[in-house]
UniProtKB/Swiss-Prot annotation:
GO terms for molecular function: rRNA binding; structural constituent of ribosome. GO terms for biological process: translation. GO terms for cellular component: ribonucleoprotein complex; ribosome. This is Large ribosomal subunit protein uL4. Pfam families: Ribosomal_L4. Belongs to the universal ribosomal protein uL4 family. Part of the 50S ribosomal subunit. One of the primary rRNA binding proteins, this protein initially binds near the 5'-end of the 23S rRNA. It is important during the early stages of 50S assembly. It makes multiple contacts with different domains of the 23S rRNA in the assembled 50S subunit and ribosome. Gene3D superfamilies: 3.40.1370.10. Keywords: Ribonucleoprotein, Ribosomal protein, RNA-binding, rRNA-binding. The keyword Magnesium does not apply. The keyword RNA-binding applies. Residues 49-106 are annotated as: Disordered.
């Protein structure tokens, strides 16, 4: 059977003025692959676990202060025998099997991380939720009002992931205070943030950087 040809998706590139400035291709190997839900769940779970601080700690009966005295004599009271006021059944006593500081991070292979990200982006692309723009605001002066109006013209959904180049300070300053908008550089793209967002907005610069970094080798993707 002949190998099935991969399709190439095309999306319009929008300007802050609302005009179409050409189109850009989304490679099928990155934006049209099957979404493996179990894989994405595993990667997101590992990513969220790695973000946990893990400094929680409780004291056992040997660590709480006090408790050297026997609360009452062994026999003759009619009550159950007790050896310390810091036993777990007493108020102020130690905690049994309580949490201790630990590392929650899990080892996830880079290929699995990259595959999960491709699946998440493909799901958004197939549903028309990936957008390309020339820039967030015209010129070098930040404008939250202009950026908000521009994003509203692209999508009415609330959670938006904006992927722009690290050098685009005007764009970052324009949207960093907008509710529901999250900003990432192309090398920071991850499965969790893509799935959490309703729409993903790429600048042409960031989209080209992501494609260039992942079409030759799909292993180098940030966790």
């Amino acid at each position: 059977m002949a190998a099935q040809e991969q399709k190439t998706l095309k999306i319009d590139v929008k300007t802050p003025a609302g005009k179409v400035d050409g189109a850009i291709e989304l490679p099928a190997e990155l934006f049209d692959v099957p979404a493996n839900i179990a894989l994405m769940h595993q990667v997101v779970t590992a990513q969220r676990a790695a973000a946990r601080q893990g400094t929680h700690s409780t004291k056992t009966r040997g660590e709480v202060s006090g408790g050297g005295r026997k609360p009452y004599r062994q026999k003759g009271t009619g009550r159950a025998r007790q050896g310390s006021t810091r036993a777990p059944q007493f108020t102020g006593g130690g905690v049994v099997h309580g949490p201790k500081p630990r590392d929650y991070s899990q080892r996830t292979p880079k290929k699995m991380i990259a595959a999960a990200l491709r699946g998440a982006l493909s799901d958004r692309a197939r549903n028309g939720r990936i957008h390309a723009i020339t820039e967030l605001v015209e010129g070098q002066n930040p404008s939250t009002k202009s950026a908000r109006a521009f994003l509203a013209s692209l999508t009415e959904r609330k959670q938006v992931l904006v992927v722009i180049g690290r050098s685009d300070e005007a764009g970052a300053k324009s949207v960093r205070n907008l509710p529901g908008v999250h900003i990432l550089a192309p090398d920071q793209l991850n499965t969790y943030d893509v799935l959490r967002a309703d729409d993903v907005v790429f600048s042409v610069e960031a989209l080209n950087a992501y494609i260039a970094a992942n079409t030759t080798t799909s292993e180098e993707v940030s966790a």
